[in-house]
């Protein structure tokens, strides 16, 4: 954003992840880590959490409409607002299979508003995938897949289409 011949950092309001998955304590941390990796200073200046919380009005956003994101942007002073929910992140064994197999079901919603470019994007996401169980022994497969989903949607925020 130009101001007196200088480019200023875009002010970024990150709405806390609305995590509706019981017994999942890592999703919010993954969400914030991916945001911190994607939106770095000096290009982006993250607005303080207490300011965003006050603008959102509650910890779990349920309204991803353009009007609501515009309100959050106005009340927080943000140029860009990012919001996401995780409604389902569940894996289960599939039987009978030749090799033990797991199926992952993941769903939620992602939205952003960029006042600089005028872009608004909202998408309900739903994904299911299968993997041989042996490949998940030394990893947190569910968390890794959620992180990939977060990264793919955060890329949309920085695109200018």
Protein language model features and the residues they cover:
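C-terminal/domain-edge helix-coil "capping" segments
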Residues: 1-13, 29, 72-75, 91, ...
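N-terminal segment of the mature soluble domain
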Residues: 8-14, 20-83, 117-119, 153-156
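A short, flexible beta-alpha/helix-coil linker loop
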Residues: 19-21, 53-54, 89-91, 132-134
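Extracytoplasmic/secreted cell-surface and envelope-processing proteins
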Residues: 23-24, 91-97
